[in-house]
C-alpha cells in the first residue's frame, strides 16, 4: 500500500460537549471539543472526525461554532457528520472550516442527496457513514450485513454491501464503515465486514467500531481499510496516536 494509512480520532459532540468520557490530564476541560481536537492535532492525528449526536436541530449553530473554532487551530482535514440533511447543511459546514461532511440517515431516506452533494461540492467532500450489523436469526439481506439507523437501534432491511455500492455510484467519496456489533466491545474491528465492502467498492474505507488495543489496527488495514477510526481508546488515554502508528509501521504500512 503506497498511500499512508490514516489514523483518525472521533469526537462525539452533544450540545457542544464531547461525550463518551475523556481523560486527558493536560487539558483544562476535557469535555471541550476544540481543546480535544487540538490535543489530537498535537499527537499528529491525520484527520479529526466530529459526530454531532445532538438529537435536536436547535444545536446546529453550536456545532458550527465548534467547527469554526477548531479550524482556527487545527490544520488537518476535519470531517463533520450528524444531522446533515441538505446540500445547504453541507455548505454551511464547509464554509466554517470542515473539509468533508458525513451523511447517514438522510442519504438512506433520500439517496439523491449523495449525488446532489457530490455534484455541487465534489466527491471528495462526501463521506457516507454506514452503521452496519450482522443479521441475527432470519436473514433478509443477501450479504448478511444490514444497515441500521438511530445508533443501531432501528433496522432498515437494507443490505449494507448493496448500499455502499449504490452510494459509490451516486458519488460518495469515502465510506465510514462502523460495525454496530463491534462498537464498544474493544475486541477488534469486524474484519469480515471490511473485506466484504472492500470487494465491492474502490473508494476509501474508514474502519470504525471495536478498537481496544494496538494490535487491533493492522488487521483492519490488511482486510482492506484505508484508514482506522477510534474514540474511547484515545479519549481514555489507553492508546496514543503514536502507539497506533508505530504498530502499523511495524507491520510494514506507511504512516505520516
UniProtKB/Swiss-Prot annotation:
Its EC number is 4.3.2.10. This is Imidazole glycerol phosphate synthase subunit HisF. InterPro entries: Aldolase_TIM (IPR013785), His_biosynth (IPR006062), HisF (IPR004651), IGPS_HisA/HisF (IPR050064), RibuloseP-bd_barrel (IPR011060). It is found in: Cytoplasm. Belongs to the HisA/HisF family. IGPS catalyzes the conversion of PRFAR and glutamine to IGP, AICAR and glutamate. The HisF subunit catalyzes the cyclization activity that produces IGP and AICAR from PRFAR using the ammonia provided by the HisH subunit. Keywords: Amino-acid biosynthesis, Cytoplasm, Histidine biosynthesis, Lyase. It is an enzyme of class 4 (lyase). Pfam families: His_biosynth. PANTHER family: IMIDAZOLE GLYCEROL PHOSPHATE SYNTHASE HISHF (PTHR21235:SF2), IMIDAZOLE GLYCEROL PHOSPHATE SYNTHASE SUBUNIT HISF/H IGP SYNTHASE SUBUNIT HISF/H (PTHR21235). It comes from the Bacteria. GO terms for molecular function: imidazoleglycerol-phosphate synthase activity; lyase activity. Its main location: cytoplasm. HAMAP family: HisF (MF_01013). The active site is at residues 12, 131. Pathway: Amino-acid biosynthesis; L-histidine biosynthesis; L-histidine from 5-phospho-alpha-D-ribose 1-diphosphate: step 5/9. GO terms for cellular component: cytoplasm.
Amino acid at each position: 500500500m503506497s498511500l499512508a494509512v490514516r489514523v483518525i480520532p472521533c469526537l462525539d459532540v452533544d450540545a457542544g460537549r464531547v461525550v463518551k468520557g475523556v481523560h486527558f490530564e493536560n487539558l483544562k476541560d476535557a469535555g471541550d471539543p476544540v481543546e480535544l481536537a487540538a490535543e489530537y492535532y498535537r499527537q499528529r492525528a491525520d484527520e479529526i472526525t466530529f459526530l454531532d449526536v445532538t438529537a435536536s436541530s436547535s444545536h446546529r449553530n453550536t456545532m458550527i461554532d465548534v467547527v469554526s473554532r477548531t479550524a482556527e487551530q487545527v490544520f488537518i482535514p476535519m470531517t463533520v457528520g450528524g444531522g446533515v440533511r441538505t446540500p445547504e447543511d453541507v455548505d454551511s459546514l464547509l464554509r466554517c472550516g470542515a473539509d468533508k461532511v458525513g451523511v447517514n440517515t438522510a442519504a438512506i431516506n433520500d439517496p439523491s442527496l449523495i449525488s446532489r452533494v457530490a455534484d455541487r461540492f465534489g466527491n471528495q467532500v462526501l463521506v457516507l457513514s454506514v452503521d452496519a450489523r450482522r443479521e441475527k436469526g432470519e436473514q433478509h439481506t443477501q450479504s448478511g450485513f444490514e444497515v441500521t439507523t438511530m445508533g443501531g437501534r432501528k433496522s432498515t432491511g437494507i443490505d449494507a454491501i448493496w448500499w455502499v455500492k449504490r452510494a459509490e455510484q451516486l458519488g460518495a467519496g469515502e465510506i465510514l464503515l462502523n460495525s454496530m456489533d463491534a462498537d464498544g466491545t474493544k475486541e477488534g474491528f469486524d474484519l469480515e465486514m471490511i473485506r466484504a465492502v472492500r470487494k465491492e467498492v474502490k473508494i476509501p474505507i474508514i474502519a470504525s467500531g471495536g478498537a481496544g488495543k494496538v494490535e487491533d489496527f493492522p488487521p483492519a488495514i490488511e482486510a482492506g481499510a484505508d484508514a482506522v477510526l477510534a474514540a474511547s481508546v484515545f479519549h481514555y488515554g489507553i492508546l496514543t496516536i503514536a502507539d497506533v502508528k508505530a504498530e502499523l509501521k511495524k507491520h510494514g504500512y506507511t504512516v505520516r
